[in-house]
Swiss-Prot record:
PROSITE patterns: S1. It comes from the Bacteria. CDD domains: S1_RPS1_repeat_ec1_hs1, S1_RPS1_repeat_ec2_hs2, S1_RPS1_repeat_ec3. The keyword RNA-binding applies. Keywords: Repeat, Ribonucleoprotein, Ribosomal protein, RNA-binding. GO terms for cellular component: cytosolic small ribosomal subunit. This is Small ribosomal subunit protein bS1. The gene is rpsA. It comes from Staphylococcus haemolyticus (strain JCSC1435). Residues 16-90, 108-173, 194-262, 279-348 form the S1 motif domain.
Length: 392
């Protein structure tokens, strides 16, 4: 009965079967295995011992090890009643690896793997077999030199499996994106308008700067970069620069965060505190004209108002009669309102009063400058016979 059973097992072993056995001998280029229930011994060539490259079979097996493998070929010498099973342990390992990776792909799970090689197009990793992380799937950020990952254990997700073509595509970027999504949701919940936090400039555009505030980018509009006018964001900040930002608004549904660098900086008015005082006479530049007066810049970003009545001693209809933008003028500080950050200025107070009257009529000048009424000429003296033909 026992002999019939064993004979049946022997006859049932065929190519493609999975068998078990014990390592009997480890040679330079192959391993000899006693197959359980087999008529012959099995041979595993070094190329079929592992999914990894090895120089010697002793790197992965030793005598007495129990192993499992696929029968890839049966060579029989009927004349001598002998033969050998050609086995592949690598094929079995690859199959198990694909089963494991498929499960991780189906469940969108993260796995850890060691980077075994850095190549031009990405990273080669060990996931029980050769896996590949393309350059485009390495990170959400730009990485110039991939060699920093060489030998490192990284967290990845399975992106694509193709057993027929022995193709395993993995993504480290997907893990970062998932982590960033969690961070973003948490940050959006915790942020409030008015919060002042630290960040790092991530990228620049024509309309502002995006600042990373902990895995989430917020926008600092160009108008919020400085108290002064900014033509280009790169004139004020640079990528990688650490900055303090104030949260202006948080749109949780749209996942948008508006930030300000300007609001964390001293205002131009605060920066001149103690520098100017009432009655000081200083130089400034006319920057803008309005119907009611002229705005004069007395320090970078600091403007004061010269009311139209303080432009000249004589009456003028519009500031444009005496001033133009860009003109340098002397002004006297009439008052400083620190609470409202306003400065009242006067040009008139810096001008001598004798400069007020401008006339080429010598007689009129004489009339205005003479204190003696008796010595003053009459209208008749001034205009002579010019009234004689007038009829009243």
């Amino acid at each position: 009965m026992t002999e019939e059973f064993n004979e049946s097992m022997i006859n049932d072993i065929k190519e493609g079967d999975k068998v078990t056995g014990e390592v009997q001998q480890v040679e330079d280029k192959q391993v000899v295995v006693h197959i359980n229930g087999g008529k012959f011994n099995g041979i595993i060539p070094i190329s079929q011992l592992s999914t990894h490259h090895i120089e010697n079979p002793s790197e992965v097996v030793k005598q007495g090890d129990e192993i499992e493998a696929y029968v890839t070929k049966i060579e029989v010498d009927e004349e001598n009643d002998s033969g050998v099973y050609i086995l592949s342990k690598r094929q079995l390992e690859t199959e198990k690896s694909y089963e494991y990776l498929q499960e991780k792909l189906d469940n969108d799970e993260i796995i850890e793997a060691k980077v075994t090689e850095v190549v031009k197009g990405g990273l080669v990793v060990d996931v029980g077999q050769r896996g590949f992380v393309p350059a485009s799937l390495i990170s959400t950020d730009f990485i110039e030199d991939f060699s920093v990952f060489d030998g490192q254990t990284i967290r990845i997700k399975v992106e694509e499996l193709d057993p027929e073509n022995n193709r395993v595509i993995l993504s480290r970027k997907a893990v970062e994106q998932a982590e960033n999504d969690v961070k973003k949701a948490s940050l959006l919940e915790s942020l409030n308008a008015g919060d002042v936090i630290k960040g790092k400039v991530a990228r620049l555009t024509n309309f502002g700067a995006f600042v990373d505030i902990g895995g989430v980018d917020g926008l600092v509009h160009v108008s919020e970069l400085s108290h002064e006018h900014v033509d280009s964001p790169e004139d004020v900040v640079s990528v990688g620069q650490e900055v303090d930002v104030k949260v202006k608004s948080v749109e949780k549904d749209a996942e948008r965060i508006s930030l300000s660098i300007k609001d964390t900086l001293p205002t131009p008015f605060e920066s001149i505190k103690g520098q100017f005082h009432e009655d000081d006479v200083i130089e400034g530049k006319v920057v803008r004209l309005a119907n009611f007066g002229a705005f004069v810049e007395i320090a970078p970003g600091v403007q004061g108002l010269v009311h139209i009545s303080e432009i000249a001693h004589e009456h003028i209809g519009t500031p444009g009669e005496k001033l133009e933008p860009g003109q340098q003028v002397n002004v006297k500080i009439l008052g400083i309102d620190e609470e409202n950050e306003r400065i009242s200025l006067s040009i008139k107070a810096t001008l001598p009063k004798e400069d007020v009257v401008e006339s080429d009529d010598a007689t009129t000048q004489s009339y205005l400058s003479n204190d003696s009424i008796e010595d003053n000429p009459t209208l008749g003296d001034v205009f002579g016979d010019k009234f004689k033909d007038l009829k009243f």
